[in-house]
């Protein structure tokens, strides 16, 4: 079923995201964000990382109030939605299933289109929500907790990964190094904030020698571990 553009009526889309440890819902009217609400999961802090089973259970508890709040903020009812979009992956399977199931239920109940969204493509296409919009073709560096990629973007749906991490993602390396330092989860933002006022030349760590456009962060993570072990001996 296609979207109804008859009489150039505004198109209202409900977006649902549940790929990891945040439950999010947004409402877009004619491409403009009119509501965006995110529920975090603090339960993972005590474990120093995301526990998939706990994440999916938290999504189940959060999905209804998060969507309701987004609709209320937008000043519309569920019946005014023209289509519903959801993250189909990549991500944590249990978490993805919660968002997918809820989105499919809405689409079936209202007989409206269901739009599947690729998580990493969405990171790139988010640049088109606000102005100025990029011109094709362009290169995009995507850096997150689970992915680090260089992507050639030829159109909205034509993308080619030309460089990627061979092991850990940059965000994952940040969080694991933060855990070594005894920082609470998620520690990556804390390291980033602290480093902003630090001395970048105070210590030297091994730099990966990877051919081409790929990345590697596991060696850096190991270098930090050995550095901390040596410092503790002193």
Q: PLM features: what roles do these ranges have?
A:
Residues 10-90, 119, 123:
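N-terminal beta-alpha supersecondary unit
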Residues 10, 117-138:
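Conserved phosphate-binding catalytic cores of ATP/NTP-utilizing and phosphoryl-transfer enzymes
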Residues 86-110, 129:
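Short Gly/Thr/Asp-enriched flexible loops that form oxyanion-binding sites at enzyme active sites
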Residues 87, 98, 114-121, 140-143, ...:
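Active-site nucleophile and cofactor-binding loops and adjacent substrate-binding regions
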Residues 1-8:
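N-terminal amphipathic/basic-hydrophobic helices that include classical n-h-c signal peptides
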Residues 80, 102-119:
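Nucleotide and nucleotide-moiety/phosphate-recognizing core
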Residues 10-11, 18-19, 36, 135, ...:
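A short helix-loop
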């Amino acid at each position: 079923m296609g979207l109804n553009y008859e009489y150039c009526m505004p198109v209202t889309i409900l977006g649902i995201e549940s790929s990891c440890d945040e439950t999010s819902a947004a409402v877009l009217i004619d491409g403009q964000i009119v509501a965006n609400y995110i529920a975090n999961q603090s339960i993972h802090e005590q474990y120093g990382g995301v526990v998939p089973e706990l994440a999916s259970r938290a999504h189940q508890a959060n999905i209804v109030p998060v969507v309701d709040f987004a609709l209320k903020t937008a000043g519309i009812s569920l019946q005014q939605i023209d289509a519903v979009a959801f993250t189909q992956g990549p991500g944590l399977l249990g978490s993805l299933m919660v968002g997918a199931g809820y989105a499919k239920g809405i689409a079936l109940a209202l007989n409206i289109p269901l739009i599947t969204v690729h998580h990493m493509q969405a990171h790139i296409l988010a640049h088109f929500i606000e102005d100025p919009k990029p011109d094709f073709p362009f290169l995009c560096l995507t850096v997150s907790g689970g992915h680090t990629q260089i992507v050639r973007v030829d159109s909205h749906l034509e993308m080619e990964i030309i460089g990627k991490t061979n092991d850990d993602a940059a965000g994952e390396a940040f969080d694991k190094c933060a855990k070594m330092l005894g920082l609470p989860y998620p520690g990556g933002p804390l390291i980033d904030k602290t480093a902003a006022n630090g001395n970048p030349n105070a210590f030297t760590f091994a730099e990966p020698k990877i051919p081409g456009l790929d990345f590697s962060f596991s060696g850096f993570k190991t270098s930090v571990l050995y550095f901390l072990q040596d410092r503790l001996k002193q």
